[in-house]
C-alpha cells in the first residue's frame, strides 16, 4: 500500500494543475503547483497517518500561494483519501484579492496507485482568510495530481 511504501522511502512530490477559483467566472484562472510531503516525520495517531506538507502554486494571473501544514493519508485499498490543512501566504498579483496575506487552505484529495511509487489523483480545496481581513471572498479550486514517491 502507499502508506507502507512511503514509510520506507522518505518523501513524496505532488505535481498538480487545475482551475483556481473555478466558481467565480470573473476570477477563475489556471494554476500549477507542487507539494512535498516528508513521510520520515509522520505520526500515527487515532486519526491515522499524519505528516507535514509544504508547497505552493501560481496562477496564470500571477497570484501565488505558499504554505506549510499537515495531511492525513487514509488507505482505502488502492485508493488513498488525503484531507489536509495548511496556513500560508498569498500574493494576489493580477488575480483575485482574497482580503489578507494570511490564508488557510483546506483540501481533500483522492488518488489511485498506478504503480508502487506513482499515483494519479484529483483534489478540491478552499482558500480563505477566516475573516482576518475586511473581506473574505475565499477561492474554490480543483486540481489533477501526479504523485511520485522517492
Residue ranges and their predicted role:
Residues 28-58:
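N-terminal, post-signal-peptide region of Sec/Tat-exported proteins
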Residues 61-85:
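Helix-adjacent hinge/juxtasegments
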Residues 36-38, 72-74, 112, 126, ...:
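Residue-level signature of outer-membrane beta-barrel architecture
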